Amino acid sequence: MPLVPDPQHPGAFRIVLGGASQSWVDPARPEHLLFEYVVQLSLLFEHGLADVDPAERIRVIHIGGAGLSIPRWIAWRRPGTAQIVCEPDVGLTEEVRRKLPLPPRSGIKVRDVDGRSGVAVMPPDYADLVVLDAFDGARVPGELVTTEFLDELVR
C-alpha cells in the first residue's frame, strides 16, 4: 500500500509510489508542510494572492493530487476556496480518502482524470490558480509540459 505511516509524526503519512515519496500529509495539521517544494508552492500562493481580499472566493485546479496535501493546506489557509483535483490514480485516491479523509465542506473535489483531460473540460477562465504537481515516478508526465498544454491552461 502506498500510504506509509511517518514514525516521526504520529498521524501523518507519506505516499510512496515506485519507491519515491510523492506526498506527505498530516490530516490533523494541514498547515504542516514537510516537503521543501510544497513549502515553496505555499509561499507562491501567499505572494500571488496578497492583494486578493481573503473573503473573495477563489477557484483552484490541481493537476495531480496524491495525498492532497496542497489542497488541504489551501482549504486551511483560505477556507471557502473551490478546488478541483485531477488525479488519475483511482486506487490511490480511494485509499487516501479512506485513511486520510478530507474535512467536511473542505471545498476539495477530486476527479478521476488525468490533468490534460481534466483541464480540457473546464470552462475558459475557470481557475484563479493552477497547481501542477503531477508525477509519473520521478518525472512530470511529458504531456503536461508541452506548449499546447500550457496554452490550454491560460485560456
Segments the model singles out, each with a brief description of its role:
Residues 1-18:
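N-terminal auxiliary segments of SAM/dcSAM-dependent transferases
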Residues 9, 31-155:
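The AdoMet/dcAdoMet-binding core of the Class I SAM-like
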Residues 18-19, 30-31:
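Short Gly/aromatic-enriched secondary-structure transition segments
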Residues 20-24, 135-138:
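A short, flexible beta-alpha/helix-coil linker loop
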Residues 26-28:
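Segments forming oxygen-rich coordination pockets for charged ligands
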